[in-house]
Curated annotation (Swiss-Prot):
Catalytic activity: L-seryl-tRNA(Sec) + selenophosphate + H(+) = L-selenocysteinyl-tRNA(Sec) + phosphate
Taxonomic placement: Bacteria, Pseudomonadati, Pseudomonadota, Gammaproteobacteria, Pseudomonadales
Stated name of the protein: L-seryl-tRNA(Sec) selenium transferase
GO MF term set: L-seryl-tRNA(Sec) selenium transferase activity
SUPFAM superfamilies on file: PLP-dependent transferases
Length: 468
């Protein structure tokens, strides 16, 4: 095959085929992409490895358009979370309700009274935007908000216990994802760790014996991401608060996931509530906004007015504070808790957590034939019972009854691993990536969180081409 002459960059730029790309991406981006593309094709064209049609204006503009679309595609992608873990840290944790999304849009689009008191016309406090709701819902005297619960714990410790000892049970020295360890956080906060008791048993006398002139606070941490069972003992919040207050010390309780309602009402495992911790005497309570609360990422610090005041004066507070979008979403989510009877209908996270297994199974039965057709005869598609998780460290041993589509390759066991990896990759390559979990030589798609059934079905025909 003889060599083919490449069109010039200028000719391509002025072509009708490139006009939409110029309009959408701008001249500079289009110019750079066309130059790169022509540079790659110059050698094959010289050696006759390309046909004339492959170098037409329409074809080259099309290839440039594909590259530009990939370059300009958002790195933030919507996905289907079919892992069975509702509050999946890697997939964004809590899904916000419509009320919160509308509040974020309003706050993003218009000026608002973030730190402006409309009554007095003077500078305000951004925490006041949710303070009234928090007092109403929890009975806390005061509140401040930072960007996550790790920041809340760090700020509270530094404000109340810097250069002093923090007394905590050895069984509560937790580690969560991302290298968050209570001993390390205490050290960063300037608090000297004084651990008491043993891994499985800590008594009131252990705390009493540890208190001395260097003591700054007592700390209690809810071990939400693991469970110690068997021969165990711990000191309840009320008793620990009495010990702390008897020595003039504050009690800081970190609830981790945190919830404002009794989850057993919806058939979910019991989690300690913020109200219970405060009623039992905790002076400061910290918890997350984007876990069981069902809101945006945030760390809430509630409790004694004087102690919250000290925390708010800490210079670290400004470094850790939240923005207007977070506060707008948080206020909207908290507002839903005023009507607990409709909470499971309106709060997305609670609705998904409490979704009946029978409803999920019926959905799986509807979807199985379409998925089987998309995968072809090389795959077995079965509807099976499944056990999901709350996620994000909440109730680690509890399971949520669910249903899943179990996808198993009809191949010898030694070949299944590669087939499953290819299927995982193909599902991730769909326009709306599908994320499942591997278990027992199969890929499981737990449907608890599949809200948009039409969108899931619409892209299944592409699956076979992705696998080929």
């Amino acid at each position: 095959m003889s060599s083919v002459r490449l069109p010039s960059v200028d000719r391509l730029l002025r072509s009708a085929a490139a006009a939409p790309l110029h309009q959408r991406y701008g001249r500079e981006a289009l110019l750079a992409t066309l130059r790169d593309l022509l540079d790659e094709l110059r050698e094959p064209a010289r050696h006759g490895a390309l046909a004339e049609i492959e170098l037409s204006e329409a074809v080259l503009a099309g290839r440039a358009g594909e590259r530009l679309a990939a370059q300009h595609a958002s790195r933030v992608r919507r996905v289907f979370n079919l892992t069975g873990t509702v509050l999946h840290t890697n997939l964004g944790r809590a899904l916000l309700p419509d009320e919160a999304i509308e509040a974020i849009t309003l706050a993003a689009r218009y000026p608002l009274n973030l730190e402006f008191d409309l009554a007095s016309g003077k500078r305000g406090d951004r925490d006041d935007l949710i303070a009234g709701l928090i007092r109403e819902l929890t009975g806390a005297e005061a509140v401040t908000v930072v960007n996550n619960n790790a920041a809340a714990v760090l700020l509270a410790l530094n404000s109340l216990g810097a250069r002093k000892e923090g007394i905590i049970s050895r069984g509560e020295l937790i580690e969560i994802g991302g290298a968050f360890r209570i001993p390390d956080i205490m050290a960063r906060a300037g608090v000297r760790l004084h651990e008491v008791g043993t891994t499985n048993r800590t008594h009131a006398k252990d705390y009493e014996a540890a208190i001395g002139p260097r003591s700054g606070l007592l700390m209690r941490v809810h071990t939400s991401n693991y469970s110690v069972q068997g021969f165990t003992a711990s000191v309840p919040t009320a008793q620990l608060a009495a010990i702390a207050h008897g020595h003039g010390l504050p009690l800081l309780e970190d609830l981790g996931s945190g919830t404002l309602v009794d989850l057993t009402r919806w058939g979910l495992p019991k989690e300690p509530t913020v109200q219970e911790a405060l009623a039992d005497g905790a002076d400061i309570v910290t918890f997350s906004g984007d876990k069981l609360l069902g809101g945006p990422q945030a760390g809430l610090i509630l409790g004694n007015r004087e102690l919250i005041g000290r925390i708010k004066k800490n210079p670290l507070k400004r470094a850790l504070r939240v923005d207007k979008l977070t506060l707008a979403a948080l206020e909207a989510v908290l507002g839903l808790y005023r009507d607990p009877d409709r909470l499971a209908e309106r709060l997305t996270t609670l609705r998904l957590l409490s979704r009946p297994a029978a409803e999920i199974r019926a959905q799986a039965e509807r979807l199985a034939p379409a998925l089987g057709e998309a995968l072809g005869e090389g795959w077995e598609v079965a509807v099976v019972d499944a056990l999901g998780m709350i996620g994000s460290g909440a109730q680690p041993v509890a399971r949520l009854a669910s249903a899943a589509l179990c996808l198993r390759p009809r191949q010898p066991r030694r070949l299944r691993g590669r087939a499953l990896r290819n299927l995982e990759e193909a599902l991730r390559g769909l326009p709306l990536p599908v994320i499942g979990r591997l278990d027992d030589d199969a890929l499981w798609l737990d449907l608890r969180q599949l809200d948009d059934e039409p969108a899931f079905l619409a892209q299944l025909p592409r699956l076979r081409s992705e696998l080929s």
